[in-house]
Amino acid sequence: MCIRDSPNPEVPGTEPPAPIKLGFDSLPTSMTDGCVVPNGYVAHVFAPWGTPLNDNAQPWDQNGNNSSNDLLNAMGMHHDGMHFFPIEGSSTEGLLAVNHEYIDENALHPNGPTLVAGKRPAEEVRKEINAHGVAIVHVRRANGRWTIVNNSRYNRRFTSATAMKLAGPVGGTDWVKTPFSPNGTQVRGTNNNCGNGYTPWGTYITAEENWAACFVNTGTRPAHQRRVGVSAGPAGRYRWETATGDATEVLGEFARFNVTETGASATQDWRNEVNGFGYLVEIDPYDPTSIATKRTSMGRFAHEGCAYSKPEAGKPLAFYSGDDSRFEYVYRFVSEAVWDPKDADRTDRLAVGAKYLDRGTLYVARFNADGTGEWLALTGATQGTGGRTLADEFG
């Protein structure tokens, strides 16, 4: 502690700086069940669950009578992370990327989820699958209110059934080969999208979080499935796999949620389907023809979000993400490529993403008892507490 006999003298002819004030009146503590904003501000609901994005969807029905096709062409359920991408720098028109993290089954269906002779109806399952994922929505503000631009070419949905690319070190390996993608370069869907991020080149990052329990293994779960929390049965979280064998099923769309090893190889059952989930997914909101890409270099876990450090020309980029499960870790991905400011203005945004996000080093944070910490590189040569390297463990 430092004690002075008298305060610091003021500099002659100057006035002390004015205290910093909020630009709005603070709100008192309240038990009000509603959205309350300060005086001079207005809040209104727009783009809620079920809002059509185009004329292929019927208006939202509060009794749960909308179809799976309606949900494929409308806002998904339970909005979470989101980001606004301006169109030509505008603050009144742009593309809103919105995560749809999970579902409320009782609200989706007229009588809640049904189970008939141990099976879920295919239409109900498709509806739930389409209520998950991400929406890219063209929005515009006029007269103080935001609205969706219906039928905009930018409006699109990514669901738990949308085909996506697997990029980085996992893509194309034996770990992700399935009957749907025998070469391991694609996977269907993104699930339980919680937090989010964005990139310096204008793409959206959606984080897959609590995806593991949507899958079930009724046999012997390998260590990597136990580690992430794949269900041991008798069913997955939503019982989507029970619709297997429905006459309308296409390419194992329901069977894939049962990752029990039953075939002679990975392309004869769905053991690897779950390995296509647990990543940060990059989406180009400005290109409605682009394919969402899972950036496997950035780690596989229950991602909560993604944030990057200040880009500096000639230096690598760093992206930070946390595993939002109990007793888990904080991670940092450092790109192999160094930042070129010209890449911020390129229109081939997913190619830029491949440049920075497909090759690099993933680190995990270690926090010491004395308050210090360090970043531990997760490479093949990294040793664990038992002295074995990651290469020894995983080959």
What is the predicted function of each stretch?
Residues 8-395:
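Conserved small-residue
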